Amino acid sequence: MVTFCMEHNWLLGLYNEAAQEDIFGKQPYIVAPGALAPRGKAVPVEGGYRVTGRWEWGTGVMHADWVMVGALTPSAAGDAQELCMFIIPIAQAQVIDTWQTAGMVGTGSNDIAVENVFVPSHRRQNIMAMRAGDSPGAKLHGTATYAMPMLPVLGLTAAAPAVGGARRAVALFQERLSQRAVYGTTTKLAEKPTSHVRLGLLRGRADALAAKLKQVARDVMAWGESGQVCPELERAALRVQIGAIVRESRDIVRDAMEASGAHAHFLDNPLQRIHRDVHTLSCHTVFDLDLACEQYGRLLLDLPANAPV
């Protein structure tokens, strides 16, 4: 949950100065779930908008100060709908207890609902500018940190716990080898060549994964430092790489779990919790590898993306 809370503070840093003064004027950081799916409707009124909707996946909402929610609202020209993110105090939102899951239980990602809540204009931000790294906050702060493209940053930050989970799963498997004996003998599994092969392969995969995550982080930061808007093709490529990192994290955890024997399934064994958490995390929409690859393939063929990148 910590990484989600961190990246949501970063998201708020992409807003204009007035919104950031509302949020950070009295404290240096806050907790705010970000439910960006267009599940709400925002009606323009004098001085702002009236927002109504219900959103899933409110990570951190049980400890929240504010909520960030996505809603459709008429464009300036009035001829289309645009997806915007609205910031609302938690006191004006309803938290609905829905988070009964096998993994990531501690995030408390319950549903969020608001009904006809007034949101001043400065607490609204068009998501399109945030995706490309061309937000008001990027211009306000003038640093590479806030000029990075949004979706790769969100994916990269959320991927870090998956990689950490994979590395920890391998470490737990290694510890278990010195404790388990071959069935019907006193020979420790740590003495068996097959165990050496499994451990070497799992550790090598986990090390390669960590190196890849760091390289993608450098690539994302480089776009922030470039002073250029990150193009769709590059954003799509980064999302494919991040999705592949999380999928490999999931597979490493699965393989370590399978190799650790039946004891790994006891509820007091941390390996089964890592297994549940990483498998649940891998299903997050930002890691949808099929969708990411589709967009990347379309852009490589000079076709327009048909989903956000």
Language model feature labels by segment:
Residues 51-53, 114, 166, 209, ...:
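Buried hydrophobic positions in well-ordered alpha/beta secondary-structure cores of metabolic enzymes
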Residues 54-93, 97-98:
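DPxDG-like acidic metal-binding loop motif
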Residues 164, 171, 200-207, 243-250, ...:
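Generic structural signal for well-ordered, non-transmembrane alpha-helical segments
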Residues 1-64:
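Glycine-rich flavin
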Residues 30-33, 101-105:
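Short Gly/Pro-enriched turn/cap motifs at secondary-structure boundaries
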